[in-house]
């Protein structure tokens, strides 16, 4: 099948298939949201998410690394994020908190992923799960954080 036909077929379905990494991020976001709202251990949250229909389609290792990594480093990540905010961290919605923690973790701990890809993925999550203009806020905060955490990478792009 030609490329154009494949693209048309995808467009005809209405949605493109999500990558395994994107699904891993979405499930990690669900877990982080649950943690923000109700608490719980990483192991308990992971066990619940492993029982979902979407789980076998995800990058399971990456999901686990994200969920456990963010939860273990949440206080440090919050300190990194706070100077980039226009209000106290605890005044953000649980969705924004979860997305920003996830984005900050990827910026800090996964230098193999380009900073623009990390920000784009976070913005897409905010568009799908956040408030009306939440994606703009997430974009602005993570842009500021990327300048701090990925200065060499950003400098090389200029």
UniProtKB/Swiss-Prot annotation:
Keywords: RNA-binding, Transcription, Transcription antitermination, Transcription regulation
Basic and acidic residues bias locations: 1-12
GO molecular function: RNA binding
Top-level taxon of origin: Bacteria
Region described as Disordered: 1-20
Protein's UniProt keywords contain Transcription regulation: yes
Function per UniProt: Involved in transcription antitermination. Required for transcription of ribosomal RNA (rRNA) genes. Binds specifically to the boxA antiterminator sequence of the ribosomal RNA (rrn) operons.
Family: Belongs to the NusB family.
Protein's name according to its UniProt entry: Transcription antitermination protein NusB
Source organism (scientific name): Nitrosospira multiformis (strain ATCC 25196 / NCIMB 11849 / C 71)
Source species taxonomy: Bacteria, Pseudomonadati, Pseudomonadota, Betaproteobacteria, Nitrosomonadales
């Amino acid at each position: 099948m030609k490329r154009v036909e494949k693209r048309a077929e995808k467009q005809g379905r209405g949605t493109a298939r999500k990558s395994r990494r994107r699904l891993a991020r979405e499930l990690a976001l669900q877990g982080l949201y649950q943690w923000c709202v109700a608490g719980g251990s990483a192991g308990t949250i992971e066990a619940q998410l492993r029982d979902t229909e979407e789980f076998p389609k995800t990058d399971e290792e990456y999901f686990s690394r994200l969920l456990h990594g963010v939860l273990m480093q949440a206080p440090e990540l919050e300190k990194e994020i706070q100077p980039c905010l226009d209000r106290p961290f605890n005044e953000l919605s649980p969705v924004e908190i979860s997305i920003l923690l996830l984005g900050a973790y990827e910026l800090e701990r996964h230098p193999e992923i380009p900073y623009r890809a990390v920000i784009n993925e976070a913005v897409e999550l905010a568009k799908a799960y956040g408030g009306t203009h939440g994606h703009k806020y997430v974009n602005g905060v993570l842009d500021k954080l990327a300048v701090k955490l990925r200065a060499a990478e950003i400098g090389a792009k200029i």
